[in-house]
Amino acid sequence: MIGLPPLVLYLFKSELFNNLIIISVMANKKLIKDVKSIFTQEFVSNLLSTAFYGNSTMRMCRASTNPQSLKAAKAKYDCTEDINAHILLHNGVINVEDYNDCDYDGYPRARELNLDKLIYGFTLCMFNSPGSYASIMEGEDDMYDDLKVIQYALFGKIIYA
């Protein structure tokens, strides 16, 4: 039963996912009631580090964010992914530079990523790429699985296979 996609029942209660309720019963009987409860510091940090490590199409960089939040994150964490995860979890924004979409000067176009977009990307991955979703939830994910979440968050679909 390991290879089966998850059974997903969903209910949207608000327009910005503040009360997004998702009940997911997977092959290992894991039950998720609120998708936001998945997004812990460790989960977001692992997702970002796996998606962007060795990635030649996109990279993370910090956007202008609340200076106090950035200072608190830098005091608490050393790793860039941990700092960026902290920023996202505290209503901040990070930029993702897309090397395949350059502006007129040849510089990569930066796209904003916040927690709501990341949750939206995760939800789209759950419905459109159940194998990747199952891998992420079981801790067996790789760059391609996590990059799907980022692409769904930024574009609403998979752009780079």
Language-model-detected regions and their locations in the chain:
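Alpha-helix boundary/N-cap detector
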Residues: 30, 34-43, 109, 113-117, ...
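Short, Lys/Arg-enriched N-terminal segments with co-localized hydrophobic residues
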Residues: 8-25
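Short, hydrophobic/amphipathic alpha-helical patches that form generic packing surfaces
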Residues: 46-53, 120, 148-157
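Long, contiguous N-terminal structural blocks used for assembly/anchoring
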Residues: 26-99
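Acidic, low-complexity, intrinsically disordered interaction modules
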Residues: 102-109, 113-117, 121, 129-132
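Extreme N-terminal basic, low-complexity initiation segments
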Residues: 2-8
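Acidic, proline/glycine-rich low-complexity IDRs
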Residues: 135-160
